From Swiss-Prot:
Record-linked SUPFAM superfamilies: Pseudouridine synthase (SSF55120)
Transit peptide: 1-35
Family matches, as Pfam families: PseudoU_synth_2
Main location: mitochondrion
Subcellular location: Mitochondrion matrix; Nucleus; Cytoplasm
Species for this entry: Rattus norvegicus (Rat)
Function: Catalyzes uridine to pseudouridine isomerization (pseudouridylation) of different mitochondrial RNA substrates. Acts on position 1397 in 16S mitochondrial ribosomal RNA (16S mt-rRNA). This modification is required for the assembly of 16S mt-rRNA into a functional mitochondrial ribosome. As a component of a functional protein-RNA module, consisting of RCC1L, NGRN, RPUSD3, RPUSD4, TRUB2, FASTKD2 and 16S mt-rRNA, controls 16S mt-rRNA abundance and is required for intra-mitochondrial translation. Acts on position 39 in mitochondrial tRNA(Phe).
Enzyme class (EC, first level): isomerase
Catalytic activity: uridine in 5S rRNA = pseudouridine in 5S rRNA; a uridine in tRNA = a pseudouridine in tRNA; a uridine in mRNA = a pseudouridine in mRNA
An annotated GO BP: positive regulation of mitochondrial translation
Assigned GO CC terms: mitochondrial matrix; mitochondrion; nucleoplasm; ribonucleoprotein granule
Record protein name field: Pseudouridylate synthase RPUSD4, mitochondrial
InterPro entries, A to Z: PsdUridine_synth_cat_dom_sf, PsdUridine_synth_RluA-like_CS, PsdUridine_synth_RsuA/RluA, RluA_PseudoU_synthase
Length: 377
């Protein structure tokens, strides 16, 4: 007689405790169903699972925290980090929406926050990477890549000039090098510069900062020093660069200010160094130059933190409030008149102005009627 199959009706399997006379209760779950549960997902089920996970993640990101400080942090992250981990095509599309001016020679964009202009260690995506894609979006698939005419720091926003031809890019670069381009930046400062308008012309050099966190910073290298109440000229360093910055306070409160800056020279981190070390008024969100001895989140007063809706432990989320507000390019190529280009403030900058009680200058309203003044969309 053949042995009964495992799936035969009435078959009972003795357990290890059969010595006590107990039997397993027949399982209602078949071996077939177990095999089905361990079977690899087919394409449809996998797609449904991925969609569900994506929707769940999106819901988490859209969920508004109940804690007001966390809400403020989420807002800052949204304004400053949304373009740092996107596909190159997405970034190129966003840059195309930020075009301030376009002609047969130039394309001028409003550079977003947090994007480096060039690649380097740890850089996943930069503006130069997507210039070929942007050119094709604007002029078709046969278009040659756009060329950079100058650079802005990763954390700086505002007017940035690109050229269609390499020769034109070199001409614009020469205008910058020979100081023929008039540049205006806006910055929110911690504390108020005194006097309210003036010129900082202290040379700048790069120096290593010793300590637990060894790093390099740009610093001041004055040409004079005080000796027994007298100003004495010191020997110039070969590593020091001439640096000149004109500034004017546009609006102020007892603890902060909106400052317009006109760099005459173009030294690395010039505006940040002149404000932080020359005027003792670091830019809001400048976590590098607010303290010479270390790299750490900027320390702010309790009053400033309260206005910004943050705690000191969350100060690291505050972005650098430095914006390339305006450029004036002289006549160049086929253009017979100067080109004035200006762009609006980024959202986080404008919100900080309101929170800190700083006013937009009235004279800025009339600038929108000037010839060749192109406002960012």
């Amino acid at each position: 007689m053949a042995a009964p199959l495992l799936g035969s009706p009435g078959l009972q399997v003795l357990s290890m405790s059969s010595r006590t006379g107990k039997l397993f209760t027949p399982s209602s779950r078949s071996f077939c169903s177990r095999a089905t549960s361990s079977r690899p997902l087919n394409a449809q089920r996998l797609a449904e699972k991925l969609r569900a996970q994506k929707q769940e993640q999106k819901t988490k990101e859209m969920r508004v925290p109940t804690n007001p400080v966390q809400r403020r942090v989420q807002e800052l992250v949204r304004f400053t980090q949304q373009l740092q981990r996107v596909h190159p095509n997405v970034l190129a599309k966003e840059l195309s929406r930020r075009i301030l001016h376009q002609d047969k020679d130039l394309v001028v964009i409003n550079k977003p926050y947090g994007l480096p202009v060039h690649g380097g260690p740890g850089v996943q995506l930069c503006i130069s990477d997507v210039l070929p894609i942007l050119a094709k979006m604007l002029h078709g698939h046969k278009a040659e890549p756009l060329h950079l005419c100058h650079r802005l720091d990763k954390e700086t926003t505002g007017v940035m000039v690109l050229a269609w031809e390499k020769d034109m890019a070199h001409q614009v670069q020469e205008l910058f090098r020979t100081r023929q381009v008039e540049k205006k930046y806006w910055a929110i400062t911690v504390r108020v510069p005194l006097p309210s308008a003036g010129v900082v012309d202290i040379p700048i050099m790069e120096k290593e900062v010793a300590g637990q966190q060894q790093h390099h910073k740009m610093t001041l290298r004055p040409s004079y020093r005080m000796d027994n109440g007298k100003m004495v000229k010191v020997r110039a360093s070969r590593d020091a660069h001439v640096a000149v910055t004109q500034y004017q306070v546009l609006s102020s409160t007892p603890s902060s200010a909106l400052v317009e800056l006109q760099p005459v020279t173009g030294i690395k981190h010039q505006l940040r160094v002149h404000l932080a070390f020359g005027l003792d008024c670091p830019i809001l969100g400048d976590h590098k130059y607010s303290d010479w001895n270390r790299l750490a989140p900027q320390k702010l007063s309790a009053g400033t933190l309260k206005k910004l809706g943050l705690q000191q432990s969350k100060a690291r989320y505050i972005p650098l409030h430095l914006h390339a507000r305006q450029l004036i390019l002289p006549a160049l190529g086929s253009r017979t008149e100067e080109l004035l280009l200006a762009c609006k403030l980024p959202h986080f900058f404008a919100r900080s102005l309101r929170r800190l009680g700083l006013d937009m200058p009235n004279e800025d309203q009339s600038r929108s009627h000037e010839a060749r003044h192109v406002e960012a969309r």
